[in-house]
Amino acid sequence: WIMGHMVNGLEQVSEFLNLGANAIEFDIDFDNNGIAKITHHGIPCDCGRLCTKQTVFTEYLDNIRHVTTPGDPKFREQLILLALDLKLQRIPVEKAYAAGVDVATKLLDHYWQRGKSKARAYILLNIPLVEDYEFIRAFKDMLKNEGYEQYNDKVGVNFTGNEDLDEIRKVLEKVGVDKHVWQADGITSCFTRGTDRLTEALKRRDTPGYNYAYKVYAWTLVKYSTMRRSLRLGVDGVMSNYPDRVVEVLKEEEFAGKFRMATYDDNPWKKFTS
């Protein structure tokens, strides 16, 4: 999975897809009551990027619905995963449940259209900190209460704050999640980061019966050297400001026989076995 990073403007969707991304990540900004308002990262952000692009969240979902619906004039077959970077760290922790209800409702109304839409992308809920775990409970409660639990098949969760992997596992156990789990490891592209935690996450992914890391990806990689380093470790995905660079690296002799771009037929909730 090549994940285009911080794709918050509508015009950026095609831009990142044209560069080779098959997944996009966008930031969800909330008001103080936990209502998802806009796609927006804000300052500071990655070096060399404009931090202020934004779109009304519901408009973004309406647009991306077209882009991920087969037969639609805007359809782009390669876009198979949407990663929602939920900026829950900016709101009171007691509003995490309200935020989960709101995001689930907006996906139901504007992306899935309560069963009418044929939009097919998988959804990854990127949660910054384990303290915001009530978001997951609320999201699942909302789908159940509204009678749309079938969409759980399309949704996964991922904690992005580089917290202790055992703490993440405990929180997932608390909310009853033991499948559809990704694990991110990384840092803003302005800095370098070691590989100790990433290596541990990959080790757990490869442990039979471990259900709290089906896929592991590294972010936000901009240097060819760090892309190669992560691929050598065996990551499932790379998040980058430059998807075209990842595409280039994947074509190199060292990696061409080991990796390929994920397609819609690849289940993001299953561990890859060669």
UniProtKB/Swiss-Prot annotation:
Q: Where is the protein found, in the record's own terms? A: Secreted
Gene3D superfamilies, alphabetically? Phosphatidylinositol (PI) phosphodiesterase
Per its record, the protein catalyses:
an N-(acyl)-sphingosylphosphocholine = an N-(acyl)-sphingosyl-1,3-cyclic phosphate + choline; an N-(acyl)-sphingosylphosphoethanolamine = an N-(acyl)-sphingosyl-1,3-cyclic phosphate + ethanolamine; a 1-acyl-sn-glycero-3-phosphocholine = a 1-acyl-sn-glycero-2,3-cyclic phosphate + choline; a 1-acyl-sn-glycero-3-phosphoethanolamine = a 1-acyl-sn-glycero-2,3-cyclic phosphate + ethanolamine
Active site, per annotation: H5, H41 (nucleophile)
- The enzyme's main class, written as a single word, is lyase
Role = Dermonecrotic toxins cleave the phosphodiester linkage between the phosphate and headgroup of certain phospholipids (sphingolipid and lysolipid substrates), forming an alcohol (often choline) and a cyclic phosphate. This toxin acts on sphingomyelin (SM). It may also act on ceramide phosphoethanolamine (CPE), lysophosphatidylcholine (LPC) and lysophosphatidylethanolamine (LPE), but not on lysophosphatidylserine (LPS), and lysophosphatidylglycerol (LPG). It acts by transphosphatidylation, releasing exclusively cyclic phosphate products as second products.
Question: What is the protein named?
Answer: Dermonecrotic toxin SaSicTox-betaIIB1
- The species this protein belongs to is Sicarius albospinosus (Six-eyed crab spider)
